[in-house]
C-alpha cells in the first residue's frame, strides 16, 4: 500500500493530530448556514459531526455523559448508537461556532494526552470499546475522526485529505475486512475477488472463497501488485475504485447504486461484494 498506513504509536498520534486539525480548520472556515448542511452520515449535520468528535474525545478525557434524552431517531438502532447520539443531542441547540471553539479547546488537550502514552505503550486503556492498548485505541480514533472529517468535506464540497495517514489507515481497515465480507457475500466456492484502489492511496488485495467446516471462508491470497502464479485462473472478478469511493462505501455512506467503480469479470459478483463491504457499526 502506498502511502503506507501508520502503525507505530508515534505515527498514529501524528495521524490523529492531522485529521483532528483538519476537522478544526473546516469548522473554523464554515459559514453559519453551512453548519446545518446535511451529511452522508444519516441524521447528522456538519455541526453534528463536530459534536460527535468532541463527544467521544471528551468521554475519553473523563467528561461525564450528557444528561439528555435522545428519543426515537431512525438512525439510532442500538445502545452504542444511543451513546454516540447523546453527545450530538446535547449540542443541537448550541451555535456552530461555539461547538467549533469547544473542539479548539479540547483538541490540543487530547493531542498532549496521546503523547503521554508514549511513556508506556503497553498499558491497557479503558475505552467505550473495552480495554485497548494505546496503538489499538489510537487506530480506532484515527479512522473515526478521519471518516467524520470526510463527512464534513463532502457536505461542504471541500474534498481532500485523501492521501493522508488517516486515509491510508481507513483503506487498510476496509481491505483487512475483505475476507470476512467476501465470505458473507454468498459467492460460489472457488470465486476470486480482487480489489484495487487506484489512488491517491494505492493498494491491491485478493480473496478466494473456499470451503471450511462446511461454510464459505474468505482466504486472503495476496497483498501487492500481482496475483501469485496460478491464482488468476478461474472465476476472478476485479473491482477498481478510487480511495474516495472505497472509503465512502466502507463507511456505509454511499449506496452501491451511487458508487463509481470499474469491473473486470462478473458484474453481479462485484455488486455482492460491494454490498457487503461496509465496516462501520
Task: Give the positions of each predicted feature.
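Acidic/His-leaning functional-site neighborhoods
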Residues: 197-238
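Short, helix-capping/interhelical loops that line the mouth of catalytic, cofactor-
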Residues: 1-11, 60-116
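C-terminal interaction segments
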Residues: 227-281
Amino acid at each position: 500500500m502506498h502511502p503506507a498506513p501508520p502503525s507505530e504509536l508515534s505515527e498514529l498520534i501524528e495521524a490523529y493530530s492531522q485529521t483532528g486539525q483538519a476537522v478544526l480548520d473546516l469548522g473554523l472556515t464554515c459559514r453559519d448556514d453551512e453548519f446545518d448542511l446535511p451529511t452522508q452520515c444519516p441524521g447528522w449535520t456538519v455541526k453534528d459531526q463536530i459534536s460527535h468528535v468532541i463527544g467521544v474525545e471528551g468521554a475519553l478525557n473523563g467528561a461525564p455523559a450528557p444528561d439528555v434524552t435522545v428519543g426515537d431517531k431512525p438512525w439510532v438502532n442500538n445502545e452504542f448508537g444511543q451513546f454516540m447520539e447523546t453527545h450530538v443531542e446535547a449540542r443541537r441547540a448550541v451555535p456552530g461556532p461555539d461547538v467549533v471553539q469547544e473542539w479548539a479547546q479540547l483538541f490540543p488537550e487530547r493531542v498532549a494526552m496521546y503523547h503521554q502514552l508514549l511513556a508506556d505503550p503497553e498499558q491497557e486503556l479503558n475505552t467505550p470499546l473495552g480495554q485497548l492498548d494505546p496503538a489499538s485505541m489510537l487506530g480506532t480514533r484515527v479512522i473515526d475522526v478521519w471518516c467524520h472529517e470526510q463527512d464534513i468535506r463532502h457536505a461542504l464540497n471541500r474534498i481532500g485529505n485523501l492521501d493522508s495517514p488517516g486515509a491510508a489507515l481507513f483503506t487498510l481497515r476496509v481491505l483487512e475486512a475483505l475476507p470476512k465480507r467476501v465470505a458473507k457475500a454468498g459467492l460460489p466456492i472457488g470465486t476470486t475477488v480482487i480489489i484495487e484502489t487506484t489512488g491517491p492511496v494505492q493498494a491491491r488485495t485478493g480473496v478466494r472463497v473456499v470451503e471450511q467446516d462446511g461454510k464459505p471462508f474468505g482466504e486472503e491470497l495476496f497483498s501487492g501488485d500481482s496475483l501469485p502464479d496460478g491464482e488468476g485462473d478461474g472465476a476472478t472478478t476485479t473491482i477498481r475504485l478510487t480511495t474516495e469511493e472505497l472509503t465512502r462505501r466502507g463507511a456505509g455512506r454511499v449506496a452501491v447504486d451511487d458508487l463509481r467503480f470499474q469491473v473486470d469479470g462478473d458484474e453481479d459478483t462485484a455488486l455482492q461484494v460491494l454490498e457487503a463491504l461496509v465496516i462501520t457499526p
